[in-house]
């Protein structure tokens, strides 16, 4: 598993579990808002008044409405 996946999953999982509202910016500039309902290797299910399946390759940026506390894997902890 790559480092990108190692960081991506805990980040999306924290957003999902804590029901943190997010803004998702797509590569074409469109802004989507809602809460992460679920995700897998290829898609994110975003819930607002409706549910939207957003393909990860179309996502540029995910911006949480508040700071997210991540449980970092040991191999990614900063060294002293």
Swiss-Prot record:
Pfam families linked: Hfq
Residue ranges annotated for the Sm domain, each copy included: 9-68
Family matches, as InterPro entries: Hfq (IPR005001), LSM_dom_sf (IPR010920), Sm (IPR047575)
UniProt keyword annotations, A-Z: RNA-binding, Stress response
Sample GO molecular function, one term: RNA binding
GO process terms (BP): regulation of DNA-templated transcription; regulation of RNA stability; regulation of translation, ncRNA-mediated
Role played: RNA chaperone that binds small regulatory RNA (sRNAs) and mRNAs to facilitate mRNA translational regulation in response to envelope stress, environmental stress and changes in metabolite concentrations. Also binds with high specificity to tRNAs.
Subunit structure comment from the entry: Homohexamer.
NCBIfam families on file: Hfq (TIGR02383), PRK00395.1 (NF001602)
HAMAP family in the record: Hfq
Protein's UniProt name: RNA-binding protein Hfq
Organism: Thioalkalivibrio sulfidiphilus (strain HL-EbGR7)
Lineage, top ranks: Bacteria, Pseudomonadati, Pseudomonadota, Gammaproteobacteria, Chromatiales
């Amino acid at each position: 598993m790559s480092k990108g996946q190692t960081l991506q999953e805990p980040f999306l999982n924290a957003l999902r579990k804590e029901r943190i509202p997010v803004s998702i910016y797509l590569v074409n500039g469109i802004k989507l808002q809602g809460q992460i309902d679920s995700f897998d290797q290829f898609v994110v299910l975003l819930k607002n008044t409706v549910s939207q399946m957003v393909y990860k390759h179309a996502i540029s940026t995910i911006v949480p409405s508040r700071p997210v506390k991540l449980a970092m894997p040991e191999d990614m902890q900063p060294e002293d």
